[in-house]
Amino acid sequence: MAVEGRPPTPKSILRGHKAQVHAATFIRNNERLVTGDADGFVIAWDLTIMRPRAVWQAHDNAILGIAGWGNDRIITHGRDNKLIVWKLIGDDEARMSTTLPLDPCAEPRPKPWILHLLEVNTMNFCSFSYCPVSAPVLPGQQEGQSQDTAQESRFESELLIAVPNTLASEAIDIFHLPSQTRRHTVKLGDKNGMVMAVALFNQADSLTLVAGYENGLAIVAHRDPVKNDWVPLYQATCHSQPILSLSVSPARDFFLTSSADAVIAKHPLPSVVSQDTTSTHATTTQAAQVSESEESSSPVNTGDKAVGKSLLGAALAKEKQNPSSQPKRSLKPEEVLTHPLKTVNTKHAGQQSIEIRSDGLIFATAGWDSKIRVYSTKTLKEVAVLKWHQVGCYAVAFAHIAPNTGAPSINDQNPKATVSTTGTQPATSDSLGHGTQKPNMDQSLTVVPKLVELTVRDKRLRQAKAAHWLAAGSKDGKVSLWDVF
């Protein structure tokens, strides 16, 4: 943590890359930081000891992007026209090399198992984006299982990948994994230049694509499932130079763009206005409202059978249980928006990378002037400047912040309080298995053995997962790791 009145300093400096670092991401609940350089090397850093756990050359050219897929897969995108999905679990790291690219290595470094390989276009210098396949609530879905749970399980097995089109540099291809088939080709204009940055995600039960172009234009488009076409919802040109990076807020209510110029723009993400494709469904909806009013005035259920329920209400209830019988909704957006929410001239040209933290409060940029700048997402005001590197920075990444971690850093927390609130206490359960709590005196006594049982490894792991890491990759091949917010 930075001391008041003194400039912040990095928590750690990770030295190992021989070439400039182009990509970085946190995986496995912040246990690992994965970085990629201009020579195609990938390093998986163990943040409990700040040492490499796996080093291999993933591509024959520069790394454009890295992302984690679940806890056992890593996606890398290189300028050798390849996008590769690697399988790397904890047990696999034991056979991997830990010899850094800086150190000479006589023998070739072993590589993880390749699960999927896509031939893609990398002439744009545009990294990929990914999202889970949309998971609607199925008729056979168990009661109480939320759509988020279904989508999370779908994310473990299926994925959509967005990359620039192989032939037309202004178009975007969307591939499906694991089938490795192309699902969509999206072309949102002819005179915008190359695609420079993309983001793909699900919003309002529809697939949403955000694209930044060479002429400084940013576009948001939704896919209409009925027309099988992409409908623009927003477009604005806020930059005089090519867009270098974009980041979508976790709440899916806005996105940010940075460029080779000094402008940072905050753009809206319009919501989709749904409209039923048939008047029959509209009539059914009105009938459902009438049925609900009838049910509210009907007698209370007695036993296992409802008394006084209308036949229409029973039919509609059955229809609700089978969503597939309802017609698809056509997405009818309103007028295309053309004005950003806010723009700011930072006076610092060339903000290569931009990323919003998972809590949506702040975002950071990596600048060509070697500085990492932190801004407020609400006001776009600069709140911190992190200076350590002597040359330009090309990559920035935030660790995932758990919703219940409100403290600025693990260093400011009381270790005893942490253990007492997060540790399990089986001694406090009664004979029936109910989670009753003992008095405060007994509760304080159970804290001491918990502290003793924690090993050094456990403490480091707890600290690595709870820290609010900010990683920055630079042209000098070094990665600075900060914990300041």
UniProtKB/Swiss-Prot annotation:
Q: Which GO terms describe its cellular component?
A: nucleus
Its gene name is asa-1
Q: Name the Pfam families for this protein.
A: WD40 (PF00400)
**Which ranges are annotated Polar residues under compositional bias?**
406-431
Q: Which GO terms describe its biological process?
A: chromatin organization
Q: What is its main location?
A: nucleus
Which Cys pairs are S-S linked?
A: none
Tell me, in a sentence or two, what this protein's role is.
Component of the ASTRA complex involved in chromatin remodeling.
SMART domains, per this entry?
Answer: WD40
Ranges annotated as biased composition (Low complexity): 274-291
Task: Write out the ranges of the repeats annotated as WD.
Answer: 16-55, 58-96, 238-277, 346-385, 451-485
Name its species. Neurospora crassa (strain ATCC 24698 / 74-OR23-1A / CBS 708.71 / DSM 1257 / FGSC 987)
InterPro entries attached here? WD40/YVTN_repeat-like_dom_sf (IPR015943), WD40_repeat_CS (IPR019775), WD40_repeat_dom_sf (IPR036322), WD40_rpt (IPR001680)
Where does it localize?
A: Nucleus
Which residue ranges does the record annotate as region Disordered? 273-304, 317-339, 406-440
Complex formation:
Component of the ASTRA chromatin remodeling machinery complex.
UniProt name for this protein: ASTRA-associated protein 1
Q: State the Gene3D superfamilies in the record.
A: YVTN repeat-like/Quinoprotein amine dehydrogenase
Q: Which PANTHER family would you find in this protein's record?
A: GUANINE NUCLEOTIDE-BINDING PROTEIN SUBUNIT BETA-LIKE PROTEIN 1, TRANSDUCIN BETA-LIKE 3
